[in-house]
Structure formats: C-alpha cells, structure tokens
Amino acid sequence: MRWLKCLNNGLVSLSSYKHLFNMNIAESGAVGDAITVHDFSEKILEQTVHFHVIKLNGGFFLWVGSNPVLSNLAVSMESKFDSMPLSTLVLGDPSDTTPNSLAQRLTKRTKKQVYVSYGLPMTDSNLSLLVENRIKKEMEVHPDKF
C-alpha cells in the first residue's frame, strides 16, 4: 500500500487521503481530475473581500476573507435522508453560523461537497448576503471553477 507523508510527519494511507478529499488518484500517483485554483476579489461595503476556490473532484474548498487567515471552517454534503444538506463546523467559533449556512446553501446549489472558511467579521448582516451574491455571480460566470 502506498503512503503519503503528512505535514506533521505522520503517515496516512493513500485510500484515506482519497476519501478525505473525495479525489480520484490512481495508484501510480497521477491525478484523474486536476485540482484547480481560482481567485477573485471584490470591494463590498468599503472592504476588500478576497475569494479563493480550490476545485476538487466532487466538491470544492472556498476561502472568504480580508486577511490571510484560515478560520471558521465548515463542511457540508448532501444527505440521502434529508433535502437539507448536512453541515458541521470543523474549526472556529461555534457561535458564528455563517460558514455552516453558506456551505449548506452552496451544497444545495451545486450538489457537491463544500468546504467553507469564512474569515469576515459578523459586524454587518448585509455583508454576508452581499458576499454570497458575489459568489453566486462568480459561479454563473465561471461554473467550471466550482
């Protein structure tokens, strides 16, 4: 069995790695579907918001923020038992439901597994709505990036 070395010098099996990111990796090490990266920015309510999308096979990772910090990471996926996608907060402040809600709505829209890291302050409720509208606009213009 092939093993991949982790950043923390631990070992994880190739099959575990494939399952974690739902990727299609051949035993030779070649990637079936390429991982792509897409970046865009927008000035929203006098604040520059950056978006970073990493497209995976069967899903994508979306980072939203104004500072380069990974925070409030949520994951969402479809459920065969409920029309509302499942979601959980992996990292961050449990009182901030924005990443969970955004991940759920993106999963419902795309039918994909979605990871969302949302690093914007909860100071203005309009900000999260405008951010989500900007993401939807980008998805319409560049559907192949998500």
For each of these PLM feature ranges, what is it?
Residues 107-139:
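Short, compact, well-ordered microdomains
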Residues 4, 137-146:
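C-terminal helix/juxtamembrane-tail motif
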Residues 2-69, 74-77:
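N-terminal, charge-rich interaction modules
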Residues 65-67, 93-94, 118-119:
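Fold-independent oxyanion-binding glycine-rich loops
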Residues 70-111:
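Short, internal acidic amphipathic alpha-helical interface segments
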Residues 59-62, 88, 112-115:
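Structural motif
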Residues 29-33, 41-42, 85-91, 142:
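N-terminal/domain-start segments enriched in small and hydrophobic, helix-friendly residues
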